[in-house]
């Protein structure tokens, strides 16, 4: 897909301009882990990437609870091969343009193709391929059942013999009530199972994008931890190699220059500031956990009585295995790291003319900064909460979704391109209603209705 080429060119240009301290590396969470290293890397960079990716990222993939729950390292490579072959076959049969348009729409919604509260049952790629034909035929019969129009008998009139029985209406579509009966947060799954106009091959591609989005779901919640863990171990391993005399001073100087560039955190008033560097934040917290275990201060014993003075390896492994970014920061961000990174809290209220410095470096401020920073890494804050609430199967077949607005934050400018892609997949009008505290704040439609064009 063209989006991957766009991403590759962006990384390539940044690398050529020297804007990446760590060499570009590719690591696949498979079993065994597969890592790709650039041929033009220096010896130091090859050693660094091996320590960072093959040891750091690999151990995080194998240990963290989110990856253990949501990913199946045994079968991902086989499934990627299956997906590539299937999409190539679709391009040959239906044309590149048709497949690309479908992938555009699926990629726009891929963050809404995740079951956040269910654990998928992993199956092998062979079983996936074996089930494909059966799934295509079954899904099409289910969709035909969903959208079949059968007149309901008048009230008080018994159905004719041989008419629709409960066995012929497994979804309960002709018994009244709203469909779906409960809001659905997995938009791609709902599209795959219920879109009335999609062909079987299109449903399979929606499924492929949905399964890959599910596979990458843990990475979206653990970037700070994952990169911090990898940086901690490449720093630890490289220093151990030097201490044991296996590398010389020249290689270490080259390493330290690269490492410093990776974990650099520009100040808020720097022209290069673009937010918190996840490498810097994660590395600082993991290094601080080790310090608290090895040489705790009185402040550390007050804030972290459970880990102060404990064995650092066990504590680090516990932190790596049992947290995601949000809970990791809430649990382990210390006052020292807050001071070192010079963190403070600004409140920018759209209903107040002035900015407020809401937290500084005191006991109360440390807690507020930690709470505010951890909440920024919660998916519920970073991504809009959008759910399917109704498909008008007896009316115009339109699809209605609700967006639960938080803290008066409206949807961004990309809302119309996204619902256009959703309408392309669904095939009928799409209505998106933003709500906060039970009140409607705005309505979006595609195709665009006249009253929404002038809405503010």
Label the predicted regions:
Residues 1-14, 106, 112-142, 146-168:
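Low-complexity, highly charged intrinsically disordered N-terminal segments
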Residues 32-49, 216-225:
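Short pre-active-site segment immediately N-terminal to the catalytic Zn-binding motif
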Residues 30-32, 55, 195, 213, ...:
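Short, flexible loop/turn elements at secondary-structure junctions
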Residues 173-274, 278, 283:
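Long, internal scaffold/assembly segments composed of regular secondary structure
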Residues 1-33, 67, 156-198, 442-444:
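Auxiliary, metal-adjacent structural segments of Zn-dependent hydrolase domains
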Residues 58-127, 230-246, 257-269:
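Post-HExxH zinc-binding segment in Zn-dependent metallohydrolases
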Residues 40, 44, 60, 246-456:
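Non-catalytic terminal regions of proteins
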Residues 52:
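TRNA-recognition modules of translation machinery and tRNA-sensing kinases, especially anticodon-binding
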């Amino acid at each position: 897909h063209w989006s991957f080429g766009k991403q590759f060119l962006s990384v390539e240009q940044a690398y050529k301009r020297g804007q990446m301290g760590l060499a570009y590396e590719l690591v696949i969470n498979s079993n065994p882990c597969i890592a790709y290293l650039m041929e033009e890397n220096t010896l130091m960079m090859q050693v660094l990437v091996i320590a960072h990716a093959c040891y750091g990222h690999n151990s995080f993939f194998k240990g963290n609870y989110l990856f253990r729950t949501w990913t199946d390292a045994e079968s991902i490579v086989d499934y990627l091969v299956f997906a590539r072959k299937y999409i190539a076959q679709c391009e040959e049969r239906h044309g590149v343009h048709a497949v690309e348009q479908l992938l555009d729409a699926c990629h726009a919604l891929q963050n809404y193709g995740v079951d956040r509260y269910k654990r998928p049952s992993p199956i092998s790629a062979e079983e996936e391929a074996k089930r494909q034909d059966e799934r295509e035929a079954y899904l099409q019969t289910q969709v035909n059942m969903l959208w079949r129009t059968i007149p309901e008998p008048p009230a008080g009139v018994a159905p004719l013999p041989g008419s629709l029985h409960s066995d012929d209406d497994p979804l309960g579509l002709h018994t009244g009530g709203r469909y779906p009966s409960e809001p659905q947060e997995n938009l791609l799954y709902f599209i795959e199972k219920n879109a009335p106009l999609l062909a079987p091959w299109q449903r399979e591609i929606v499924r492929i994008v949905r399964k890959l989005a599910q596979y990458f779901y843990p990475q979206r919640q653990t970037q700070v931890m994952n990169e911090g863990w990898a940086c901690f171990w490449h720093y630890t391993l490289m220093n151990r190699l030097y201490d044991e005399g296996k590398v010389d001073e020249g290689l270490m100087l080259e390493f330290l220059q690269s490492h410093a560039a990776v974990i650099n955190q520009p100040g808020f008033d720097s022209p290069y500031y673009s937010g918190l560097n996840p490498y810097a934040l994660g590395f600082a917290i993991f290094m601080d956990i080790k310090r608290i275990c090895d040489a705790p201060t009185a402040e550390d014993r007050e804030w972290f009585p459970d880990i102060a003075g404990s064995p650092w390896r066990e504590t680090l492994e516990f932190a790596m295995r049992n947290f995601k970014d949000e809970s990791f920061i809430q649990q382990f961000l210390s006052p020292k790291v807050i001071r070192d990174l010079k963190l403070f809290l600004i409140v920018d209220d759209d209903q107040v003319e002035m900015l407020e410095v809401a937290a500084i470096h005191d006991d109360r401020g440390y807690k507020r900064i930690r709470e505010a920073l951890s909440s920024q890494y919660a998916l519920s804050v970073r991504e809009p909460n959008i759910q399917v609430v109704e498909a008008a199967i007896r009316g115009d077949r339109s699809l209605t979704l609700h967006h639960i607005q938080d803290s008066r934050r409206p949807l961004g400018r990309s809302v119309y391109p996204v619902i256009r892609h959703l309408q392309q997949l669904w095939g009928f009008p799409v209505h998106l209603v933003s709500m906060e505290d039970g009140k409607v704040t705005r309505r979006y439609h595609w195709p665009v209705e006249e009253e929404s064009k002038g809405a503010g």
